[in-house]
Design a protein with these regions (language model features):
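Conserved ATP-driven motor cores of ASCE-family P-loop NTPases powering translocation/secretion/packaging/pilus
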Residues: 214-216, 220-316
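A composition-biased, non-transmembrane "mature-region" signal
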Residues: 331-335
């Protein structure tokens, strides 16, 4: 369980654990996911200078923490704190490592060339969005690892449950987007257990790699289930191209009442059927009947936009050994409400995972979280101090 609102009911997990970051491209993916979740408008501007600059800078910091002392301080909170140190201290430290020297050359060129306004803009575009994630509770959950994100590992299978908070959607969504992107990379492999990625209210997070996961994960026994209100939400938050890939690559779709473009898109997806039409004309002498055929929508948009509660339309896909003759449906899904109520009556509250009690039984949660927050700040101060002394000695 990952629960940012209540640390008592949350495990701790470091999404950029050094054991699962083998290359600087992993650091870039993590930085990319975080930045685009914090700045949804950047999804439409990928490749722009002031979009790529903060991603490159944060990726360099993450990879530096991965190679410094074998990843001892490679956590997301440490990366945020290091980013917020003076750039006059951070840049010399990062560029003292050969694998990061070329990575940061655009920043060094601006600094050494006196383009201070440009440099300030590049750095601010990284610092400002990430500063929204400076939170002792967030730092607590993301700074240690009580489990790993390879949920379908045959040696350590697990079910991971995470939840967002509508009041803090922009902040938590960025953190959850990072967890999701790391999970996708780890589970979409051969030789793992069957697994499922189930995401409700998908547009609340930017899920990098979602289109690729849908397209390739089936062969690796990963099922993807996505829930959202309307296709237009997906286009708004993922961009037109990526949204179309997601919409067109899913094999099964279930839809309740939707209107507008979404209803038209679904109607087109369900296809057309040859319909017979009979027309009768009556005059004084006789009655004439004509019959013709015409291709009409199998489920027209007007029917989709007028569905009542419990009525669904959709299509399902089959495979070689399990053929489905009737792939398109328009039906009522019957729910056994009594059974649902009985099941809900047996629900158990999320258990206390960390009770934060000292030897005398006193509640010390606030102090423990604050101590962890301050320790991360001290760690980063010490890293900068030691590294500057090393550089001065060289």
């Amino acid at each position: 369980v990952i629960n940012f609102d209540d640390p008592r009911r949350s495990h701790r997990c470091n999404p950029i654990h050094p054991d699962f970051m083998s290359d600087i491209s992993d650091a870039y993916e993590s930085a990319y996911t975080i930045m685009l979740n914090l700045n949804k408008t950047w999804v439409q501007k990928q490749g722009d200078f002031f979009v790529e600059s903060p991603i490159i800078l944060f990726a360099a910091i993450i990879w530096y923490l991965r190679i410094y002392k074998n990843g001892k301080y490679c956590t997301f909170p440490h990366a945020i704190e290091l980013l917020n140190r003076r750039y006059e201290d951070v840049f010399p430290i990062l560029t003292s490592y050969p694998e990061l020297e070329n990575y940061l050359s655009p920043f060094m060129d601006a600094w050494q060339g006196g383009a201070m306004e440009q440099l300030a803009g590049q750095i601010a575009s990284a610092k400002i969005p990430l500063s929204r994630m400076i939170s002792p509770q967030l730092y607590w959950v993301m700074s240690a690892s009580e489990f790993t994100l390879d949920i379908n590992n045959p040696e350590e299978p697990k079910i991971l449950c995470v939840g967002n908070n509508p009041d803090r959607q922009n902040i938590y969504g960025a953190a959850l987007g990072l967890y999701n992107s790391r999970i996708v990379k780890l589970i979409n492999k051969k030789g793992q257990l069957k697994s499922s990625v189930i995401i409700d209210e998908l547009p609340t997070i930017y899920f990098k790699g979602l289109d690729n996961l849908i397209a390739t994960a089936r062969s690796n026994k990963v099922a993807v289930c996505l829930g959202f209100q309307d296709f237009s939400q997906l286009v708004r938050d993922y961009g037109d191209k990526e949204a179309k890939v997601v919409i067109n690559t899913v094999g099964n779709i279930f839809s309740g009442q939707v209107v507008g473009e979404t209803a038209k898109t679904l109607s087109e997806r369900f296809g057309k059927v040859l319909q017979k039409r009979q027309s009768i004309s009556i005059n004084r002498q006789d009655v004439s009947t004509s019959i013709n055929t015409q291709m009409d929508s199998l489920i027209p948009p007007s029917k989709i936009s007028g569905l009542t509660q419990g009525m669904f339309v959709g299509s399902v896909s089959d495979n070689f050994t399990e053929r489905i003759e009737q792939k398109i449906f328009h039906a009522e899904i019957v729910v056994d409400t009594d059974k649902v109520k009985r099941e809900e009556s047996h629900y158990q509250p999320i258990p206390i995972i960390n009770d934060f009690k000292d030897a005398d039984g006193n509640d010390c949660m606030k102090q423990a979280i604050l101590d962890n927050y301050n320790q991360i700040k001290e760690d980063v101060k010490l890293i900068v101090k030691d590294e500057l002394e090393r550089i001065a000695g060289d």
